């Protein structure tokens, strides 16, 4: 009888093509997502060596990082470097026979949103992309992680990837979430608990009642930020919620193929007694709405808390780092989070740009008006999300309140397009990173949930969504 295995063990082992004595493995890759930023050199490498894309049908390309989200984007991209990257992806996809979603395609959007929408992402698969937030797809019980440009070329050419097996970590969130606390708060709390290096060398499996109770979109938010906790990937075992989400997607198996896939997917659970190298347990009932205060995703505190005092940190290097973060953020220890005034609000990204995120924001916003000193924008994660939101009338709620309603793309998550902060502007953002300069030179980012961001836009400062009327 074989030893009990974790979900990660099972998926990894099922995809090993070759294993060396030193533990290095060659893994078969089921799905490869490609965008304009990390792929040009990879395609050029194929071209120079006379190679083809080995499995174009397992590859899907989309523009997301550099595209404008302005309604005027049909007139083209102003920035020359960004325009060249977008044009290069269109040409490379055509030359190598890869399916491509341009900015004029209703299916276009952020790569980690369009994969699940199309059923390109399925349980039990190995999925890679030249993007760190590929871990998002782990919400489906898939082994998904980012790769570098040289690895992008390797996967395009061979449909395989050289890997070493990571260690197993279990993060269990027990109990039920309180009203007003979301998947975004869960993952920020986890990162606050383990730190941004806590998951280094691990693949995290998320489990527990609070995780199981989440929708697929909530689960994607959790897995999306696994990388911010230092992990290689994040996984949530597939269940009936997963199967219901996947079933009618365009690329999902049909008929007998669906039945066979379902039978296999149901085996992809961690066995009882499977060994985890590290276990973290959180009590969902004790989690508050969370706001980041510094320049690292681990710098988090309850919305009812205060900006911490770095002088109380005993580790000298960490203390110095947090003092720098406070200086960058323009904050003073002891300041109430609810006293922090805002200039900008961004609702979108591969973390929180899906239809449920927009519904949550609309529920808070309806009948209200954006604070006069706040510039607020909502960016749907894909053309299909935008279409659905408009069918539900959410755009009218946003526009009536004074929000900008944009075209799909990565937008203000990162300063690679026209949507960015000016120096010292302070932003409540539903994205995943609050690094220095992430949203623009000297821009100041606070990570929050969509409902918290929406309420902050109306109030002009952070408020506890649990008290929102």
Swiss-Prot record:
CDD domains attached to this UniProt entry: IPMI (cd01583)
Binding locations of [4Fe-4S] cluster: 350, 410, 413
Reactions it catalyzes: (2R,3S)-3-isopropylmalate = (2S)-2-isopropylmalate
CC cofactor: [4Fe-4S] cluster
Cross-referenced InterPro entries: 3-IsopropMal_deHydase_lsu, Acnase/IPM_dHydase_lsu_aba_1/3, Acoase/IPM_deHydtase_lsu_aba, Aconitase_4Fe-4S_BS, Aconitase_4Fe-4S_dom, IPM_dehydratase_rel_enz, IPMI_cat
Cofactor note (record): Binds 1 [4Fe-4S] cluster per subunit.
The protein's annotated pathway: Amino-acid biosynthesis; L-leucine biosynthesis; L-leucine from 3-methyl-2-oxobutanoate: step 2/4
E.C. numbers: 4.2.1.33
One annotated GO molecular function: 4 iron, 4 sulfur cluster binding
Keywords attached to this entry: 4Fe-4S, Amino-acid biosynthesis, Branched-chain amino acid biosynthesis, Iron, Iron-sulfur, Leucine biosynthesis, Lyase, Metal-binding
Keyword field contains Iron: yes
Lineage: superkingdom: Bacteria
Pfam family, one: Aconitase
SUPFAM superfamilies to which the protein is assigned, alphabetical: Aconitase iron-sulfur domain
Physiological role: Catalyzes the isomerization between 2-isopropylmalate and 3-isopropylmalate, via the formation of 2-isopropylmaleate.
Xref: HAMAP family: LeuC_type1
Protein name: 3-isopropylmalate dehydratase large subunit
Organism for this UniProt entry: Mesorhizobium japonicum (strain LMG 29417 / CECT 9101 / MAFF 303099)
């Amino acid at each position: 009888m074989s030893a009990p295995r974790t979900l990660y063990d099972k998926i990894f082992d099922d995809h090993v093509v070759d294993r060396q004595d030193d533990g290095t493995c060659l893994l078969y890759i089921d799905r490869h997502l490609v965008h304009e930023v990390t792929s040009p050199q990879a395609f050029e490498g194929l071209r120079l060596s006379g190679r083809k894309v080995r499995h174009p049908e397992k590859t899907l390309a989309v523009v997301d990082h550099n595209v404008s989200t302005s309604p005027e984007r049909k007139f083209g991209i102003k920035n020359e470097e960004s325009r060249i990257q977008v044009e290069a992806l269109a040409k490379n996809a055509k030359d190598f026979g890869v399916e491509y979603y341009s900015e004029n395609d209703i299916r276009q959007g952020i790569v980690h949103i369009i994969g699940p929408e199309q059923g390109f992402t399925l349980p039990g698969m190995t999925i890679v992309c030249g993007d760190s937030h590929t871990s998002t797809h782990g919400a489906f019980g898939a082994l998904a992680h980012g790769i570098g440009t040289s690895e992008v070329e390797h996967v395009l050419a061979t449909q395989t990837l050289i890997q070493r097996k990571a260690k197993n970590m279990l993060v269990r969130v027990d109990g039920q979430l309180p009203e007003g606390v979301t998947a975004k708060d869960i993952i920020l709390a986890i990162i606050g608990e383990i730190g941004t290096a806590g998951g280094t060398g691990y693949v995290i499996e998320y489990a527990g009642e609070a995780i199981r109770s989440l929708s697929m979109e909530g689960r994607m938010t959790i897995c999306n930020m696994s990388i911010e906790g230092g992990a290689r990937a994040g996984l949530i075992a597939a269940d009936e919620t997963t199967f219901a989400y996947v079933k009618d997607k365009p690329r999902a198996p049909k008929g007998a193929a669906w039945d066979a896939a379902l039978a296999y997917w149901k085996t992809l659970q961690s066995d009882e007694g499977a060994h985890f190298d590290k276990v973290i347990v959180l009590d969902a009932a004790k989690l508050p709405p969370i706001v980041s205060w510094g320049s690292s995703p681990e710098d988090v505190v309850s919305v009812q808390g205060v900006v911490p005092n770095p002088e109380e940190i005993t580790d000298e290097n960490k203390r110095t780092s947090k003092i720098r973060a406070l200086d960058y953020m323009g904050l003073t220890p002891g300041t109430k989070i609810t006293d922090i005034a805002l200039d900008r609000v961004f609702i979108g990204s591969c973390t929180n740009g899906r239809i449920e995120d927009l519904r949550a924001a609309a529920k808070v916003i309806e009948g209200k008006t954006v604070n006069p000193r706040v510039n607020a924008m909502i960016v749907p994660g894909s053309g299909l999300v935008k279409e659905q939101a408009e069918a539900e009338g959410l755009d009218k709620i946003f526009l009536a309140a004074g929000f900008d309603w944009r075209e799909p793309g990565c937008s203000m998550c990162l300063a690679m397009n026209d949507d960015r902060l000016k120096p010292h502007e302070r932003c409540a953002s539903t994205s995943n990173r609050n690094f220095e300069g992430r949203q623009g030179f000297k821009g100041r980012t606070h990570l929050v949930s969509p409902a918290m961001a929406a309420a902050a836009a109306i109030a002009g400062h952070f408020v506890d969504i649990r008290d929102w009327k």
